[in-house]
Amino acid sequence: MAEFFNTPGGIAVIILAQTLAVVAFVMISLLFLVYGDRKIWAAVQMRRGPNVVGVYGLLQTVADALKYVVKEVVIPAGSDRTVFILAPLTSFVLAMIAWAVIPFNDTWVLSDINVAILYVFAVSSLEVYGVIMGGWASNSKYPFLGSLRSAAQMISYEVSIGLIIIGVILSTGSMNFGDIVRAQDGDAGLFNWYWLPHFPMVFLFFISCLAETNRPPFDLPEAESELVAGYQVEYSSTPFLLFMAGEYIAIFLMCALTSLLFFGGWLSPVPFLPDSPLWMVAKMAFFFFLFAMVKAITPRYRYDQLMRLGWKVFLPFSLIWVVFVAFAARFEWFWGAFARWSTGG
């Protein structure tokens, strides 16, 4: 049996099993993310939230998903049927395949490539195509305006995210997530993590992730008071479910990136406790809690304020920080906190 797994067929079986495990983890997490999002929002507003289906309403998300699946798929007259159906599928698939390079410890990763950051950045940049396709194919003014907003918003904040990530790459000398996490390992526990030397960028990265994933207060592409529901106006049933699932999976991915880049990934925050994938999951859950709290307590920005923040505040500050980190890493300022060459770079 052991010899079989060394053959091409056995290797294919292992890869398939690993892929299914990652998909299962993301999809099961998705159910709890939606439930948690609704519960947190309800708690802030002093409501109960989901509490009928299952114990404490835990099965409410499953019931809602089944409701969407059994509904009829309504395609508007005059729309491009092929593109209309492909749009939500594109958003969902692109959100899923980004997880191929996300590690949960030194060995629990589907594809441990040396350009993992570049891969995630490229895939997340492509997700805007699903939104644009959905807005254009609907043949309606509100979806089209929402898709244009989304394209401009995502492109604007991807620049800031990219520059912030470059700062981490300069400190580590690698684009591999495993190397970045190992560079944050040390006897000081959480004080070895990159949140300390890159402290200002943690806030910019988190806010940029909110804008990148169209989360409040930056949910302009689907602003109900202005665009009804934006690019999702004409969608119902399974296509709408795919759009929503893709959005939450992208949010969870940003939580994973924040954990890996700045908070040590699977590393323990205290030296006397062992490192574990559970630390990674706990950190991701904490950052999703912050996503949900921001949604519950902040008002929506105006579109011009959103774009001004991205281009006139975040972009210059991120660019200045990259230059600063480059010099700090080159000359090993601050006791070498910005120069942790885990790969011998």
Swiss-Prot record:
It catalyses: a quinone + NADH + 5 H(+)(in) = a quinol + NAD(+) + 4 H(+)(out). It holds the Pfam family NADHdh. It is a multi-pass membrane protein. Coiled coil: none annotated. Its main location: membrane. The chain crosses the membrane at residues 13-33, 84-104, 115-135, 161-181, 190-210, 248-268, 277-297, 309-329. It is found in: Cell inner membrane. InterPro entries: NADH_UbQ_OxRdtase_su1/FPO, NADH_UbQ_OxRdtase_su1_CS. Its EC number is 7.1.1.-. GO terms for molecular function: NADH dehydrogenase activity; oxidoreductase activity, acting on NAD(P)H, quinone or similar compound as acceptor; quinone binding. One of its GO terms (biological process) is aerobic respiration. GO terms for cellular component: plasma membrane. Keywords: Cell inner membrane, Cell membrane, Membrane, NAD, Quinone, Translocase, Transmembrane, Transmembrane helix, Ubiquinone. NDH-1 is composed of 14 different subunits. Subunits NuoA, H, J, K, L, M, N constitute the membrane sector of the complex. Belongs to the complex I subunit 1 family. NDH-1 shuttles electrons from NADH, via FMN and iron-sulfur (Fe-S) centers, to quinones in the respiratory chain. The immediate electron acceptor for the enzyme in this species is believed to be ubiquinone. Couples the redox reaction to proton translocation (for every two electrons transferred, four hydrogen ions are translocated across the cytoplasmic membrane), and thus conserves the redox energy in a proton gradient. This subunit may bind ubiquinone. PANTHER family: NADH DEHYDROGENASE SUBUNIT 1, NADH-UBIQUINONE OXIDOREDUCTASE CHAIN 1. This is NADH-quinone oxidoreductase subunit H. The gene is nuoH.
